[in-house]
Structure formats: C-alpha cells, structure tokens
C-alpha cells in the first residue's frame, strides 16, 4: 500500500513501545480496564458503519483493533513494552519465547564476542579441526590406555587364548556345591557378613 504512493513514508519499526498507547490515547503502563474503556469509546467513534462517508474511518478502526488486541494480550504487551513493534515483528517471525534470545544475540557485545572468537580460531578453522579431524590432525588426541600404537587381536589368536583358558579351568574342579533351599531358607545367612571373594 505504501509502495503505490511515492510521497507517503514507509512505517518503520519502533523500539520504544509507545505508538499503540498513543493510538488509544493512553499513557504507557495503563491498566487493562483503562485499555478496554478507551477501546470501546474509540471503536464506537471510528466504526466504519457509523462513518460511511469517511474513508479513513476503516483504517483508523483497524489500527484501534490492532492496538487493543496487542495491549490486552499480556505476553504481547510485555514484548511490546520492552522492545516495541520490532519485538512484535520478531515474535511473529521466530516465536514469542525466542524474542529475548534474538535481542541478546543481536546485541553489540554478542556480535563482538562472535568476531573475537572467529579471529582467535582462524575463522573457526581450529574448532572444525578439533571436531572433525581428531584434535589438530591427531597431535592432541587422548593417549591410548593400551601400550603400543594399535591393539589388534586376530581371530586365530583369540580362539587359541579361549582354548588355553578353558584347559586351565579344567585343572581346578568345582568343589563347592549349591545348598538345598526351601521357603524357610534365608537368602542372607546369619552371622558376620563377608564381602571378599576369597574362600
């Protein structure tokens, strides 16, 4: 609409959060009751059906409705009071819960911190190397707990180890048999408890 009329200035986003209050003729921080009373009066005064010969009445009525809708919704009103119409635009684009995050990340100190970290890491090149290339091409990777570079056991060696372990276990027969249990047998025996595994 503003593009068709060359002399009309495009409406800009405010950060003060006062324009909607001015539309209703209220001061910033007015109560909900004051907003409702003023809205009713202005809506009746500027309703298009009451002013059929005034072409600006419909536009004024839309502005009054918009101001009332935003100022009676507490979430939108808090955003508007804090960030102005720019805050409402951000809430519409990214969601009401992300408005604070957006303004925090677009602050001068967040941008400065982002640039400084970028410069210190060589345009984030070191961060990429740490995550993708195992810490500076492997120079800073954690030391292995096993001696030697790589620990590899071939399947044949593993089978041979299992066979020798089984042969050694054959030399020591099981000498302790389980006791017979019934419903009166206690799971924990009486007397001092010993937690060591040696018999």
UniProtKB/Swiss-Prot annotation:
It comes from the Eukaryota. The modification Phosphoserine is found at residues 14, 16. One of its GO terms (cellular component) is cytoplasm. Coiled coil: none annotated. It holds the Pfam family DnaJ. Palmitoylated. It is found in: Membrane. CDD domains: DnaJ. The keyword Lipoprotein applies. Residues 19-84 form the J domain. It is a lipid-anchor. PROSITE patterns: DNAJ_2. The keyword Lipoprotein applies. InterPro entries: DnaJ_C_subfamily_member5, DnaJ_domain, J_dom_sf. Keywords: Chaperone, Lipoprotein, Membrane, Palmitate, Phosphoprotein. Interacts with the chaperone complex consisting of HSC70 and SGTA. PANTHER family: DNAJ HOMOLOG SUBFAMILY C MEMBER 5 HOMOLOG, DNAJ HOMOLOG SUBFAMILY C MEMBER 5B. This is DnaJ homolog subfamily C member 5B. It comes from Sus scrofa (Pig).
């Amino acid at each position: 609409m503003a593009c068709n009329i060359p002399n009309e200035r495009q409406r800009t986003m405010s950060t003060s959060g006062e324009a909607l209050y001015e539309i209703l003729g209220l001061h910033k921080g007015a109560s909900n009751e004051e907003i409702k009373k003023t809205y009713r009066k202005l809506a009746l005064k500027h309703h298009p059906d009451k002013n059929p010969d005034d072409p600006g009445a419909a536009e004024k009525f839309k502005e009054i409705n918009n101001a009332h809708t935003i100022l009676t919704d507490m979430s939108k009103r808090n955003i508007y009071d804090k960030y102005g119409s720019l805050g409402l635009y951000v809430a519409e684009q990214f969601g009401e819960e992300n408005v604070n995050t957006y303004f925090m990340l677009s602050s001068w100190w967040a941008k400065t911190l982002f640039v400084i970290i970028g410069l210190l890491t060589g345009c984030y090149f070191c961060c990429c190397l740490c995550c993708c290339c195992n810490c500076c091409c492997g120079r800073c990777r954690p030391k292995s707990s096993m001696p030697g570079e790589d620990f590899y056991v071939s399947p044949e060696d593993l089978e041979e180890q299992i066979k020798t372990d089984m042969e050694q276990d054959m030399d020591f027969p099981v000498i302790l048999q389980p006791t017979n249990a019934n419903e009166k047998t206690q799971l924990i025996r009486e007397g001092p408890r010993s937690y060591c595994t040696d018999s």
